[in-house]
Design a protein with these regions (language model features):
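Phosphate-binding glycine-rich loop
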Residues: 30-77, 91-95, 101-103, 168
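Solvent-exposed, non-membrane alpha-helical residues enriched in polar/charged side chains
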Residues: 19, 23, 41-45, 64, ...
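PLP-dependent aminotransferase-like
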Residues: 68-157, 164
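Conserved donor-binding loops in enzymes that form glycosidic bonds
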Residues: 7, 132, 179
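N-terminal "arm"/small-domain region of PLP-dependent enzymes with the aminotransferase-like
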Residues: 1-30, 35
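Conserved active-site segment immediately N-terminal to the catalytic lysine
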Residues: 155-180
Length: 180
């Protein structure tokens, strides 16, 4: 097997800082909704250029919460791409909605925006673009289509945290952004 990255080497490069931060949280005894979580949320919102950031258990939970917050419910349709981790579609199904898939492009493996409009029906309530491999989907086109059809945009940026699209961070351009 050819490893794609060396996580031990990555850890070693910031070991002291990570160990100190983890020990601070452990010694505080405050793991949920504590001072460290509040500080992280504030700093991460600043980093992403958003007003808020809310820490939750995992990326799937973040997507489910975002879908519910955007009013997506049973029987609604949500357009996304099949080129993603299964939790993108799983989160749509978890709220009782139906995932509607568009293909990805052969050069970026991101959502093929040319296919979005043909998938929109009266049941469509949202689009979940998936940012992958440190690249952002074409958010100008996606947001324009969403605005035209009055759809919500929920960004799945779990695989592109810190990625940049025309000066904006992944997860900061739609109605909600989910990063894990």
């Amino acid at each position: 097997m050819i490893p794609s990255m060396n996580v031990v080497r990555q850890y070693e490069s910031i070991r002291e800082e990570l160990d100190q931060a983890a020990l601070e949280v452990l010694h505080s005894g405050s793991y949920i909704l504590g001072e460290s979580v509040e500080r992280f949320q504030t700093e991460f919102a600043d980093y992403c250029g958003t007003k808020y950031a809310i820490g939750v258990g995992n990326g799937t939970d973040a997507l489910v919460i975002a879908l519910r917050a955007c009013g997506v419910k049973a029987g609604d349709e949500v357009i996304t791409t099949a080129m993603s981790f299964f939790s993108t579609a799983e989160s749509i199904a978890a709220v009782g909605a139906i995932p509607v898939f568009v293909d990805c492009t052969s050069d970026t493996y991101l959502m093929d925006t040319a296919q979005i409009e043909e998938k929109i029906t009266e049941k469509t309530k949202a689009i979940i673009p998936v940012h992958l491999y440190g690249q952002c989907a074409d958010m100008d086109v996606i947001c324009s289509i969403a605005q035209k059809y009055k759809l919500k945009v929920i960004e799945d940026a779990a695989q592109a945290a810190g990625a940049d699209y025309k000066g904006k961070k992944a997860g900061s351009m739609g109605d909600a952004g989910c990063i894990s």
